[in-house]
Amino acid sequence: MALPTAQPLLGSCGSPICSRSFLLLLLSLGWLPLLQTQTTRTSQEAALLHAVTGTVDFASLPTGLFLGLMCDEVSGLSMGHAKELAMAVRQKNIVLQVHQLRCLARRLPKHLTNEELDALPLDLLLFLNPAMFPGQQACAHFFSLISKANVNVLPRRSLERQRLLTGALKCQGVYGFQVSETDARALGGLACDLPGEFVAKSSEVLLPWLARCGGPLDQGQAKAVREVLRSGRAPYGPPSTWSVSTLDALQGLLVVLDESIVHSIPKDVITEWLQGISREPSRLGSKWTVTHPRFRRDTEQKACPPGKEPNVVDENLIFYQNWELEACVDGTLLAGQMDLVNEIPFTYEQLSIFKHKLDKTYPQGYPESLIKQLGHFFRYVSPEDIRQWNVTSPDTVNTLLKVSKGQKMDAQVIALVACYLRGGGKLDEDIVKALDNIPLSYLCDFSPQDLHAIPSSVMWLVGLHDLDKCSQRHLGILYQKACSAFQNVSGLEYFEKIRTFLGGASREDLRALSQHNVSMDIATFKKLQVDALVGLSVAEVQKLLGPHIGDLKTEEDKSPVRDWLFRQQQKDLDSLGLGLQGGIPNGYLILDFNVREAFSSGAPLLGPGFVFAWIPALLSALRLS
């Protein structure tokens, strides 16, 4: 399972010393009274006490001791010891909490060399005062490290972040509101805090950065972003020219769009984009690729430090910095030890880096040997990723379905099953049972070819509105399967079962159904194929609808009722006594042209106007003959 932050691993010290946290360390430094109670002197305790008489070797201490560090304990350390402690935290890749970092920063010496800064944890530097580094060279080095730190450790608009931003701009030589791409890279995460005046003057540089910022924009930033987008300036141009990829790129800026901007975006673009994110929610604010651009930048600039490349997935990776995970961990190592990836409590951020590494290792999709070992890691895979897979084993499908149960992963599950069917797989009883809690509307998401692999027994589970978004081709295939599934059912029970699938029924099927007085409701009638419906006579439709025949009047101006009316003799419609209009007047010919075959324009089925237009030509031809 994943945890929001790294937690101490139980038993990582190998003795009860971890449960006493940092007390023994403080005792070893000689400024805490001796414990009144006697404790068992383990080898680790002896090492701590030995530190009093010599140089303190913090790097040799167990990781668990650092994780329990308290402010009161740190305040008793000398500045030299505090610096050595901080360096050990960096060396051991230990993740400290905010209050621990702040306390430790207060005890550091006021003068630090570049070499000493390099040896400190990056996130610890966020709590240092930039005034400690006067001069262009010193401040440039300090802020080059800050740009790689996770500034979100500090709350947005906190005094510490404001102090860092002011210092960074001054060090970079920015005195107006214009910043370059180089300036933005130098600021790193601090670029997310630049006020609206900077956004207005440097929109081409800053808007892509703001789109990737994790937190909400402040009022000034949001106003400036809206003005830039409304004006059609770079980098996105006028809203009327936006595409689906533009909306994807906007990401965190979408929330500031106002009504005037939204109305300027082409409607078909909005529709396509909304359909895309409904199928793949991970496209909206995806954290796999854009949330932390600094990780990719760090990887390009830094190689894996000597001795840091792991040969096994273990707890030590928890304490790697994110850039070290990117630089040092190999995708094939992760693929071969997915059981350990799932067992160790990595953070969500670390797991996202692991996924990025796997995606780079297998750009054409994960092999099935890896897929069957994904376990809980399956939760971090998007439907788009799954569509690249080739899954042939029902055991693989069943394993991942168990992992996804209760996790709100319908989109991933549907993509997985579709992938399996595409590879020639068949839905067995276990897979069908695992899909019980997912609405069967997923049948519409499969390709028509995949539907042939669905067992007919599944049709018994389809609900009344499950197929509402299915295409005509889907319905035609599913109707045939439903007929097979319900072949031993008759009467009204048969109609209740087959009703959901009637959108795929042919004219002959509807004609046969009309002989059973099924009393079809108008909602079902409206879902019938137009091509099948228009060939039915008034008497046949009357038998189909039964007591619901009067509902035709409310739908006479809408398809498919309108299409059916155009093909009927008006005198037959009059016999219903409903006042239906639009039929063919008495004495006129009924011409049955197949428009789709005769005309390449794909016009709708013939109405009376089309028929009337041809009658004079036909009469002239008859006179000539």
From Swiss-Prot:
Specifically expressed in lung. Overexpressed in hereditary renal carcinoma developed by Eker rats. Proteolytically cleaved by a furin-like convertase to generate megakaryocyte-potentiating factor (MPF), and the cleaved form of mesothelin. The modification Phosphoserine is found at residue 202. The keyword Acetylation does not apply. InterPro entries: Mesothelin, Stereocilin-rel. Keywords: Cell adhesion, Cell membrane, Cleavage on pair of basic residues, Disulfide bond, Glycoprotein, Golgi apparatus, GPI-anchor, Lipoprotein, Membrane, Phosphoprotein, Secreted, Signal. It is found in: Cell membrane; Golgi apparatus. One of its GO terms (biological process) is cell-matrix adhesion. Transmembrane segments: none annotated. It is a lipid-anchor; GPI-anchor. A lipid is attached at residue 600 (GPI-anchor amidated serine). Residues 601-625 form a propeptide. Residues 1-35 form the signal peptide. Disulfide bonds join 304-328. The keyword Cytoplasm does not apply. Glycans are attached at residues 390, 488, 517. Pfam families: Mesothelin. One of its GO terms (cellular component) is Golgi apparatus. Membrane-anchored forms may play a role in cellular adhesion. Megakaryocyte-potentiating factor (MPF) may potentiate megakaryocyte colony formation. PANTHER family: MESOTHELIN (PTHR23412:SF6), STEREOCILIN RELATED (PTHR23412). Belongs to the mesothelin family. Interacts with MUC16. This is Mesothelin. It comes from Rattus norvegicus (Rat). The gene is Msln.
